[in-house]
Amino acid sequence: MRNILLTIEYDGTNYFGWQKQPNKKTVQGVIEDAIKKITGEDVNLVGSGRTDRGVHALGQKANFKTESKIPTEKFPLALNSVLPNDISIKDAAEVSLDFSARYSAKQKTYKYLIYNHKFRPAILCNYVYHFPYELDLVSMQKSCEYFIGEYDFSSFCSSGSETNSKVRRIFDCYLTFENDCIAIYITANGFLYNMARIIAGTILDVGVGRFKPTDIPLIIESKDRTKAGKTLPPWGLYLVDVVY
């Protein structure tokens, strides 16, 4: 028995999120089907986290147990030969049998892309959030700094969260520019339900003057979802990396 860790890139546009669901096309389900095609095994693919419908990944991690004799380094090519073009296995590594892509994760990084131009994009419509109004980028960057630290992030969690504790540690949060877009990067030891999208929405609200950067600690302290910004759409969000 071996435990194989995959690094996965996918376009989430045509999927009902990561997690397998009855009668719905999901990333987990499609990859499990691909593994069965090349190994003949029914496996349980454990992802580092469940991305929602429309969310993309550049570096999702997932592991599965196998009795297959396929060399570890051959798994990416073998799987990619039977996977659709919007899912790609970038790497495979053998890990200890007690390793879990979900529970062994130390930190994750997400980014949110905002297309801040007058006219909406056509080609990028499923990959960025279009926001045509002027933004105060200096204040947005300043607001990012107030998220860094360990706090109860109840204000940045949608209802329906399955976790009891809302305490998370954000290691880094900053603004940069990528391919004509504003990119908000957030690295944390874990994320609550919609946490990254709500933080991005709150930072955007700072950019239009609804909040001041110094309001962020007050919003965190309130532990009240209604005090924070809106939840931005899923298609601008990317799971960038997972560290173990």
From Swiss-Prot:
Pfam annotation, one family = PseudoU_synth_1
Q: Which top EC class is given?
A: isomerase
**Which species is listed as the source?**
Caldicellulosiruptor saccharolyticus (strain ATCC 43494 / DSM 8903 / Tp8T 6331)
Give me the residues that bind substrate, please: 110
Q: Which InterPro entries does UniProt cross-reference here?
A: PsdUridine_synth_cat_dom_sf (IPR020103), PsdUridine_synth_TruA (IPR001406), PsdUridine_synth_TruA_a/b_dom (IPR020097), PsdUridine_synth_TruA_C (IPR020095), TruA/RsuA/RluB/E/F_N (IPR020094)
Q: Any idea which residues are catalytic in this one? A: 52
Output the lineage of the source organism: Bacteria, Bacillati, Bacillota, Bacillota incertae sedis, Caldicellulosiruptorales
This one is known as: tRNA pseudouridine synthase A
**MF terms (GO), sorted A to Z:** RNA binding; tRNA pseudouridine(38-40) synthase activity
At the top level of its lineage, which domain of life is listed?
A: Bacteria
Gene Ontology BP terms: tRNA pseudouridine synthesis
Q: What does the subunit comment say?
A: Homodimer.
- Give the family from UniProt: Belongs to the tRNA pseudouridine synthase TruA family.
- Which gene does this sequence derive from? truA
